[in-house]
């Protein structure tokens, strides 16, 4: 089966069409702007899968309708998913703009005095606004000389932010969310909303009963040689934690081996259902070998599966990590309890950064006073105002231990193409696999247990759906926090010491939901959240605006908020603008 091609970035050099001197004097400068833009993007960006980003430049500069149409024909044939229009001069606004209604688009007007690039930028954006096709504005802060071919830092930042978000939009379009099972324990996020996926993300939902997973395991619809490799890998790399179950619920060695085997099989089969596996065709299972074209998935698990069979913790944790028995590879996006809305936040984070995502319960707010009362320890540093306990038995990626290192030796989570095998091994070594607690998981299983290193910048996100409003996005930038071991042990044992933990301190602003840490917890819209490495809230905001998802809560500096220019016409408060603009334009793929 032919592999679907990755979306490309289209670069549209536009020009003043007046011949006999004007156009001729601008051809080289205009095309060089396009080439410089393409060079920047191909050098600095990758797709989430790790592949190089490709740019497609119009064959000619665009002065009017005919050349715009020729450019569009080229872009349509080469899977261009977003466009950047560049110009150093005046051009004919509505005659030269990109009119595709669902393709993210930006315009860079060169800030120079010899020719009015800024005037075209304003004219073209006015046309976009009047026609209801929002576009992003890029205009350098400082005047450049006409022969200056450099890209200023502020222009570069906007080009890269737009491109990262635009590639995420284009990469999600046409893919599916694999809903493996139904509603888990009444969790609203697992009431999968097909209209949301179709209208806002351009995706389909593939609903599959969990009996399909059972069938694949029972009928051996998997690669048996790979299963043996996975078992050998686990035997080499898994460290097991204590079994905290009562004696009557503890499993013997043979039973534990069967649980491990099925847990690894679940990972293999869920992966095969998402992306397909040509090895299945070799054993006569051609239909199953195709998969469901899923870019993200969720597994219900509780309780209809977990009351009888091993839980999804091991499978989810391995799939969401950047490595397994096949080595370092792109992490999958698999939401525990089929929380599709948290799955979408995971998908956004992965598409923007290429990194694994940490799924967690937003479990407990610990005030400084409560921690001092319980442990005698006084919080300080990043934790001085209190912390939030992020913990869940399920799908936290092992990358979340932060045993990978950046160029300065700091703990982090890297894009998978930068991770060494030694770093993958370090994450495994930092993880223990604890037998599942019987009172929660009667069918057994293994929960990963690790503790996230402190001082690491993270962005916590969540998508919620509000009746009458639609989807909204929450964003909280902050840091992981390291507590003294005895303090961590006391606090962790009050919840469940067999699960992975991140102690999170959001960055406070003194206003609204970021008045204090308690307010962050109180304003969080659901029981789950996602941690994405780095302070990347600005990228999430730009992506959300492309999809027409308003942001209801964030602590990103106002100077970093980057949305389409038409948002400014929707009022004077930038967050109110976001709501009114998203309501005005409606979902990107209106249905």
Curated annotation (Swiss-Prot):
Source organism superkingdom: Bacteria
Keywords: Carbohydrate metabolism, Cytoplasm, Fucose metabolism, Isomerase, Manganese, Metal-binding
Subcellular location: Cytoplasm
Catalytic activity: L-fucose = L-fuculose
Gene Ontology biological process: D-arabinose catabolic process; L-fucose catabolic process
CDD domains: L-fucose_isomerase
Enzyme Commission designation: 5.3.1.25
Enzyme active site: 337 (proton acceptor), 361 (proton acceptor)
Sites where the protein binds Mn(2+): 337, 361, 528
Cofactor field: Mn(2+)
NCBIfam families with a match to the protein in the record: fucI (TIGR01089), PRK10991.1 (NF008220)
Family: Belongs to the L-fucose isomerase family.
Function statement: Converts the aldose L-fucose into the corresponding ketose L-fuculose.
UniProt protein name: L-fucose isomerase
Organism from which the protein derives: Escherichia coli O9:H4 (strain HS)
Encoding gene (name): fucI
């Amino acid at each position: 089966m032919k592999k679907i091609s990755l979306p490309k970035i289209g670069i549209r050099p536009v020009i003043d069409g007046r011949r006999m001197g004007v156009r001729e004097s601008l051809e080289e400068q205009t095309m060089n702007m396009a080439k410089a833009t393409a060079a920047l993007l191909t050098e600095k960006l990758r797709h989430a899968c790790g592949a190089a980003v490709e740019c497609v430049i119009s064959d000619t500069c665009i002065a009017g309708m005919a050349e715009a149409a020729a450019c569009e024909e080229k872009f349509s044939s080469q899977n261009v998913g977003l466009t950047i229009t560049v110009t150093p001069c005046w051009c004919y606004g509505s005659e030269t703009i990109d009119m595709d209604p669902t393709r993210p688009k930006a315009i860079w007007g060169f800030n120079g005095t010899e020719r009015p690039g800024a005037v075209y930028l304003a004219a073209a954006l006015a046309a976009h606004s009047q026609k209801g096709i929002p576009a992003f504005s890029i205009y350098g802060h400082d005047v450049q000389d006409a022969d200056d071919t450099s890209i200023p830092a502020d222009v570069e930042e906007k080009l890269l932010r737009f491109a990262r978000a635009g590639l995420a939009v284009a990469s999600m379009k046409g893919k599916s969310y694999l809903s493996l099972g139904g509603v888990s324990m009444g969790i609203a996020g697992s009431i999968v909303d097909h209209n949301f996926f179709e209208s806002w993300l351009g995706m389909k939902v593939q609903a599959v009963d969990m009996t399909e997973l059972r069938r694949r395991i029972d009928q051996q619809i998997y690669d048996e040689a790979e299963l043996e490799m996975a078992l050998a890998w686990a035997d080499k790399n898994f460290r097991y934690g204590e079994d905290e179950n009562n004696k009557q619920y503890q499993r013997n060695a043979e039973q534990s081996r069967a649980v491990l085997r099925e847990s690894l099989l679940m990972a293999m089969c869920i992966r095969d259902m998402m992306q397909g596996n040509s090895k299945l065709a070799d054993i006569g299972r051609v239909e199953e070998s195709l998969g469901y074209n899923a870019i993200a998935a969720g597994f219900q698990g509780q309780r209809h599966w977990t009351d009888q069979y091993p839980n999804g913790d091991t499978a989810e944790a391995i799939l969401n990590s950047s490595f397994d028995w096949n080595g370092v590879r792109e992490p999958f996006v698999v939401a525990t309890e089929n929380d599709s809305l948290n799955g979408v936040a995971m998908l956004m984070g992965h598409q923007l950064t290429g990194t694994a995502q940490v799924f967690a319960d937003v479990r407990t707010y610990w005030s400084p006073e409560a921690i001092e009362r319980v442990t005698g320890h006084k919080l300080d540093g990043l934790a001085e105002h209190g912390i939030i306990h992020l913990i869940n038995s399920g799908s936290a990626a092992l990358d979340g231990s932060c045993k990978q290192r950046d160029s300065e030796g700091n703990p982090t989570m890297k894009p998978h193409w930068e991770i060494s095998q030694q770093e993958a091994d370090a994450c495994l070594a930092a993880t223990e696999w604890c037998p599942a607690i019987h009172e929660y998981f009667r069918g057994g299983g293994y929960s990963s247990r690790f503790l996230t290193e402190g001082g690491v910048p993270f962005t916590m996100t969540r998508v919620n759906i509000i009746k009458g409003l639609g989807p909204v996005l929450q964003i909280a930038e902050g840091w992981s926090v390291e507590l003294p071991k005895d303090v961590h042990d006391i606090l962790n044992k009050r919840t469940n010491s067999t699960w992975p933990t991140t102690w999170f301190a959001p960055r406070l602003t003194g206003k609204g939901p970021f008045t204090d840490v308690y307010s962050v917890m109180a304003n969080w819209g659901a029981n789950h959240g996602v941690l994405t490495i780095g302070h990347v809230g600005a990228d999430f905001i730009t992506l959300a605006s492309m999809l027409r998802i308003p942001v209801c809560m964030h602590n990103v500096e106002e100077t970093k908020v980057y949305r389409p220019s038409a948002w400014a016409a929707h009022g004077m408060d930038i967050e109110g603008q976001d709501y009114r603009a998203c309501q005005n334009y409606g979902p990107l793929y209106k249905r």
